[in-house]
């Protein structure tokens, strides 16, 4: 690996005359500027459990069976900006830095995703984004512009800068390469960071990004309102979502050429919802009335408002089994991720209710963009491209939280902005759809799609001790290893093989593997052999 003279000189300057930095609070503190305070530093022998510090309501799950490492937590006060971050510094360092992301409005250090990164021997960092909260709670943002800016981008950038300084000082060596991996809000954080600070990361893996947050959040309330109030004749009860999903499966599964419980081309399916209409012959608990079919029509339609303004794309066919998140669980309200944004990010106040929603909410969100969080500076990605950065973006086709079409739209906006300037998108940005995957991870048991490729949150969604892709630790099956090959060896991924294990334990038998294709290519089965083997598929 090449280390430039300039980088070596920078390290020499940083470490000259200073005593070696060790894993204790005072020693680590000596490597920091005064804005940063080391809260604790604790060396963990191999196979340890890291006990999550009290008060971390966002990420309470303790990772287990860790590699030997120094665990550090840091608090930062930088003018009006306040945030913290956690850092694992492995004994057996791979010379590289990884930052991981957060989810929803979560305020807390994501130690569980950090642990998955530690399994590759990265020095790995997560920021708390500047506040304490669960992922669906936005109250902290009320009339608090500084907390919003920290959440929007400041905490990620500042944490990255400081964690890199600490990493360099601890090892007395430069960082060879820096990576980022996050999903949902984590996907947004990665995109926003490289739009503002193209030098922060050499490679960014962004899953199901909440990039268009100032439209996504209002849409969350809008789409929820289609199915409310729950006493209305047009309300579709949660119990009917699997019924709708089964009918979509019946009509759309074969549209990709193979009937295999995986819908991989939902837009090629000419779905006829009238097959669900209640008639005297129907099973009354497995059909929809005309007003309910009207609601279904709304759910499958883009949100377009005044003057034909496109606000947000619709949920895709095949996402029905995750609809309980946005379309009514047991409450009579849209999801908090929409309502809290309007109440506390747009400062309409706690009295605001979803019945008050109108296009003015979208206009205000457009004008204010709370926290400067929306990752829509497509043009800025040319700076990331120019300095050699690589971006890998993916989205599950069965996502019921962030409409899959918002990622397709992101791809087209980046294309429309950069292609006219002569930028070859494939040279630095590649997008992959994941048939049958829900939001960031998982697949319904009636679908059983290959969904695991070591994307952000995936290891943590099945276990407290998994890292990477067990049994398939290579760049063909592991998106982070694929990114490393792209950045370090110039080997760009054309497909990623996703894996589905029996029972999702990552230890049972492999049930299915299948390549995910680089957009706009689609999966095509060869027509010969076992559809559950990746080798019988290609991307065309
Ligand atoms: C790791 O710790 C667990 C208990 O937490 C123990 O059962 C196991 O034997 C240990 N493994 C190794 C390799 O030390
Ligand atoms: C978050 O919680 C921690 C632990 O309880 C506390 O020390 C810290 O002050 C809190 N931060 C904010 C911004 O409220
Ligand atoms: C501190 O704040 C300054 C001014 O806003 C900003 O430029 C800098 O990136 C911040 N640094 C960190 C480490 O947060
Ligand atoms: C009617 O539909 C419900 C819900 O899908 C199902 O549980 C039940 O078995 C069906 N009844 C008959 C008689 O098919
Ligand atoms: C819609 O278009 C009309 C005519 O161009 C314009 O006067 C009006 O302000 C627009 N409304 C909104 C909400 O943008
Ligand atoms: C409607 O919402 C109310 C309030 O949350 C709840 O108590 C009730 O069970 C819901 N009814 C249905 C049919 O879901
Ligand atoms: C918001 O981001 C833009 C770049 O996208 C930048 O020009 C502007 O200064 C930022 N505003 C704040 C308040 O951080
Ligand atoms: C999967 O789980 C089921 C029960 O949840 C169990 O009966 C079955 O043996 C498991 N399969 C494997 C391969 O472990």
Protein language model annotation of sequence segments:
Residues 182-192:
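Glycine-rich nucleophile elbow surrounding the catalytic serine of serine-hydrolase chemistry
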């Amino acid at each position: 690996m090449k280390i430039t003279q300039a980088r070596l000189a920078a390290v020499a300057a940083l470490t000259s005359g200073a005593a070696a930095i060790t894993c204790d609070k005072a020693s680590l503190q000596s490597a920091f500027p005064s804005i940063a305070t080391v809260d604790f530093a604790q060396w963990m022998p191999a196979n340890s459990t890291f006990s999550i510090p009290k008060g971390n309501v966002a990420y309470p799950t303790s990772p287990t069976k860790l590699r030997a490492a120094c665990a550090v937590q840091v608090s930062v006060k930088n003018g009006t900006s306040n945030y913290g971050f956690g850092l694992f510094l492995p004994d057996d360092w791979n010379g590289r830095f990884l930052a991981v992301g957060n989810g929803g409005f979560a305020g807390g250090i994501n130690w569980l995703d950090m642990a998955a990164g530690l399994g590759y021997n990265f020095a790995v960092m997560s920021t708390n984004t500047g506040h304490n909260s669960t992922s669906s709670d936005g109250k902290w943002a009320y009339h608090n512009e500084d907390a919003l800016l920290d959440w929007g981008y400041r905490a990620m950038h500042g944490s990255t800068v400081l964690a890199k300084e600490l990493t360099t000082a601890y090892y007395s060596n430069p960082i060879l390469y820096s990576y980022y991996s996050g999903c949902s809000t984590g996907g947004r954080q990665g995109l926003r960071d490289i739009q503002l600070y193209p030098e922060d990361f050499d490679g960014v893996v962004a899953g199901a990004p909440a990039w268009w947050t100032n439209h996504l959040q209002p849409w969350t309330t809008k789409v929820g309102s289609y199915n409310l109030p729950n006493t209305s004749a047009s309300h579709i009860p949660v119990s009917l979502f699997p019924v709708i999903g089964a009918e979509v499966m019946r009509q759309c599964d074969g549209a990709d050429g193979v009937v295999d419980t995986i819908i991989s081309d939902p837009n090629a399916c000419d779905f006829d919802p009238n097959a669900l209409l209640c008639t005297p012959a129907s099973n009354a608990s497995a059909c929809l009335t005309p007003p309910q079919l009207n609601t279904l029509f709304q759910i499958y339609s883009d949100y377009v408002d005044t003057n034909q303004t496109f606000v947000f794309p619709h949920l895709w066919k095949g996402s029905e089994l995750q609809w309980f998140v946005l379309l009514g669980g047991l409450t009579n309200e849209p999801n908090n991720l929409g309502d809290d944004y309007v109440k506390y990010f747009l400062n309409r106040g706690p009295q605001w209710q979803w019945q008050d929603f109108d296009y003015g909410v979208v206009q205000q969100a457009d004008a204010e963009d709370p926290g400067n969080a929306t990752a829509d500076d497509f043009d800025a990605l040319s700076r990331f491209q120019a300095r050699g950065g690589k971006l890998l973006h993916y989205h599950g086709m069965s996502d019921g939280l962030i409409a899959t079409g918002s990622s397709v739209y992101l791809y087209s906006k980046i294309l429309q902005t950069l292609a006219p300037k002569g930028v070859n998108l494939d040279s630095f940005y590649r997008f992959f759809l994941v048939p049958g995957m829900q939001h960031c991870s998982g697949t319904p048991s009636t679908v059983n799609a290959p969904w695991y490729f070591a994307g952000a949150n995936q290891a943590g969604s099945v276990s407290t001790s998994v890292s990477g892709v067990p049994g398939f630790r290579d760049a063909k099956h592991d998106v982070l290893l694929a990114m490393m090959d792209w950045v370090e060896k110039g080997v760009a991924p054309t497909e990623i093989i996703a894996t589905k294990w029996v029972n999702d334990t990552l230890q049972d038998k492999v049930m299915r593997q299948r390549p995910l294709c680089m957009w706009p290519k689609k999966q095509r089965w060869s027509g010969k052999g076992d559809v559950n083997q990746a080798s019988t598929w290609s991307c065309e």
